[in-house]
Amino acid sequence: MMMGRLVFVIWLYNCLCLLLLSSLVDADQANIDCLRTFKSQVEDPNRYLSTWVFGNETAGYICKFSGVTCWHDDENRVLSIKLSGYGLRGVFPPAVKLCADLTGLDLSRNNFSGPLPANISTLIPLVTILDLSYNSFSGEIPMLISNITFLNTLMLQHNQFTGTLPPQLAQLGRLKTFSVSDNRLVGPIPNFNQTLQFKQELFANNLDLCGKPLDDCKSASSSRGKVVIIAAVGGLTAAALVVGVVLFFYFRKLGAVRKKQDDPEGNRWAKSLKGQKGVKVFMFKKSVSKMKLSDLMKATEEFKKDNIIATGRTGTMYKGRLEDGSLLMIKRLQDSQRSEKEFDAEMKTLGSVKNRNLVPLLGYCVANKERLLMYEYMANGYLYDQLHPADEESFKPLDWPSRLKIAIGTAKGLAWLHHSCNPRIIHRNISSKCILLTAEFEPKISDFGLARLMNPIDTHLSTFVNGEFGDFGYVAPEYSRTMVATPKGDVYSFGVVLLELVTGQKATSVTKVSEEKAEEENFKGNLVEWITKLSSESKLQEAIDRSLLGNGVDDEIFKVLKVACNCVLPEIAKQRPTMFEVYQLLRAIGESYNFTADDDILIPSESGEGDFIEELIVAR
């Protein structure tokens, strides 16, 4: 009898374990399906979602996707999706319903349009942060949005919402941050909890909102009388104008379509500046001839898409040719939130930062809300394009002396920023996409100091995990814990660049040719994870780019690889070397090449000065 009970208990325990395991597997698959369907439901012209590659069976692999944060790194359960400023298009993606544990959704500063789903509360019932600002969403704000009872933050500003605000919004007891400014809303503002004390600007620039904190609403009879008068006048006016409007659009239609086709996608902002062409460009070198915005427009053919050199988190870089034939690079900053006065002050500071291994900032221009920076042109473009070209058939790999020269020069420039520049600068965006090369393959670092000019960083985990101000694959792991930028974070990012130079692999993914097979094998992870695996197996030599081997410099290559490992493998940031130490190690390896001139880097004090740089020009 006792034996029978024991067998039953064991059977029941096994059944419960199998049931739990099955539910976990189903939940993982639902989250994977959520992101896969989400990706298919939106347009991604800038290919920021290219890291969303499915089919990997590794636990937690979707947690490495750009903009995605998981509850735990070793399980496919999505905590938040943050895709602000990705340039995505489409309607509100209903696929988010499959991410059942989602608590944060940020689709701000994209090109989403159309109405919000009426059943939005059933799609994201547990979300605490919902940011849909700076899009083109339209229609009425759904009444059922008030059923997302855990909402702490609701940002709907800068859209095209119409109608009235649902009075049920006042029932959101946890709401602390809220804005509906710059829409087309009318009617009374809900009677929010008085302790919230929402400011007027959170409701500003709508058609006719009223009630606290705005002006009191008028009486119903007065409103009805006003409506009658407006309707009568509007009817007479409409009757007189309707024929003219129809004819106007009839004759304009073909021209508008043709103009849209001729207008390269992405430069409408430039055409809107035609009335600002007389705006002067501030140049740091007084010897340079005076320039105006019209000169920049002409040099870039009104910032045509064909002249784009690269697009990144800080903005888009264009190639420009002046009338005298000289070339320069012009960066359009992405959503700088600084006032013109603050921006001028920052530019004056950055304009004084000069070093052989930094891209010289020649000048800047402010026109309306646009911020344009002028840089010296670099003939060999970005290091990323030299290592990972789009056309691999005509690709000629960089030889080892060129790669070592790039490594030493970049290390020297970054060490100067950390240890000798006044003010000291933490870059925060080091990658092969911010290292430009001259005609002689002399490296120059760009984007230094730009993090402070971008949108203020929030404290959300995904900001750091996914590199809001750092390219995906280069961000030091401690950001997800400390949420503080440090020089050792730059050291980690530079270590990844060194790995790219030695291996020829991309930071975000690895493609290696098997020694046993002639086919390609894909390692399921990023470059640092691959190096970590090879290091644990004592197989680091397998990581080296084969085009570099057998030329009598194998010892130098392996030494640089070891320096890179010292930068990226320690889990504790303090165990990494300083940039000054990294530079000294690389300089010693390349001593026979005579790459570097006299040092202009101050030797750090023994007090650890390099670890505690005052962040004068970094993101707040």
Curated annotation (Swiss-Prot):
Q: Which UniProt keywords are listed?
A: ATP-binding, Cell membrane, Glycoprotein, Leucine-rich repeat, Membrane, Nucleotide-binding, Phosphoprotein, Receptor, Repeat, Signal, Transmembrane, Transmembrane helix
Gene Ontology CC terms, in alphabetical order: plasma membrane; plasmodesma
Q: How does it sit in the membrane?
A: Single-pass type I membrane protein
Q: Is Transcription among the key words of this record?
A: no
The PTM Phosphothreonine maps to T300, T463, T482
Which GO terms fall under biological process for this protein? defense response to bacterium; negative regulation of defense response; plant-type hypersensitive response
Q: Which residues lie on this side of the membrane: Cytoplasmic?
A: 250-620
Q: Keyword Plastid, does the record have it?
A: no
One Gene Ontology molecular-function label: identical protein binding
Q: Which SUPFAM superfamilies match?
A: L domain-like (SSF52058), Protein kinase-like (PK-like) (SSF56112)
Q: Where in the cell is it found?
A: Cell membrane
Q: Which residues are glycosylated?
A: N56, N111, N119, N147, N193
> Which sites bind ATP?
I309, A310, T311, G312, R313, T314, G315, T316, M317, K331
Leader sequence range is: 1-27
The segments annotated as topological domain Extracellular are 28-228
Phosphotyrosine (modified residue): where?
Answer: Y479
**InterPro entries xref list:** Kinase-like_dom_sf, Leu-rich_rpt, LRR_dom_sf, LRR_N_plant-typ, LRR_Rcpt-Like_S/T_Kinase, Prot_kinase_dom, Ser-Thr/Tyr_kinase_cat_dom
The portions of this protein that span the membrane are 229-249
LRR repeat boundaries on the chain: 101-124, 126-148, 150-172, 174-196
Chain ranges of the Protein kinase domain: 303-596
Q: Which Gene3D superfamilies did the record assign? A: Phosphorylase Kinase, domain 1, Ribonuclease Inhibitor, Transferase(Phosphotransferase) domain 1
Domains (record comment): The protein kinase domain is predicted to be catalytically inactive. Lacks the conserved Asp active site at position 429, which is replaced by an Asn residue.
Protein family per UniProt: Belongs to the protein kinase superfamily. Ser/Thr protein kinase family.
What name goes with this protein? Probably inactive leucine-rich repeat receptor-like protein kinase At5g48380
Organism name: Arabidopsis thaliana
